[in-house]
């Protein structure tokens, strides 16, 4: 997963090169880089806007030095990722605000997961997320 910053300062999530890689493999045998950031429903062949919220959460984990599902090989993830566990375990030094924000990204049930507008209302470290973030 990649974070892109447009010339207008808009932050966007993307999967650089994923399209060509994904065409080569079935969903059961994905060999794409970045599967650690996929939402659980993506492995079932489903995609919703809230799937990008999950990916945003994994990007934040990576920025914090946490590799999502680091105990698993990427080839195991299509059967393991998000089925019964969040990729985030709060560490002692993680701020309460940041932890709360990240946890909003990782609800296993898509219908219960925050959407982008709800995330923008979550206060993080005393400041509101900029409305220029587009998923």
PLM region spans:
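Conserved activation segment of eukaryotic-like protein kinases, specifically the C-terminal portion
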Residues: 28-41
């Amino acid at each position: 997963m990649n974070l892109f910053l447009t010339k207008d300062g808009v932050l966007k999530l993307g999967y650089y090169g994923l399209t060509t890689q994904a065409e080569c493999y079935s969903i059961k045998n994905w060999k794409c880089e970045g599967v650690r950031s996929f939402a659980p429903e993506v492995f079932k062949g489903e995609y919703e806007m809230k799937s990008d919220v999950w990916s945003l959460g994994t990007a934040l984990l990576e920025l914090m030095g946490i590799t999502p599902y680091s105990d698993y090989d990427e080839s195991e993830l299509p059967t393991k990722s998000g089925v019964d566990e969040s990729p985030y375990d709060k560490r002692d030094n993680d701020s309460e605000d940041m932890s709360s924000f990240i946890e909003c990204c990782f609800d296993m049930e898509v219908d219960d997961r925050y959407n982008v507008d709800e995330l923008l209302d979550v206060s993080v470290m005393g400041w509101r997320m900029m409305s220029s973030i587009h998923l």
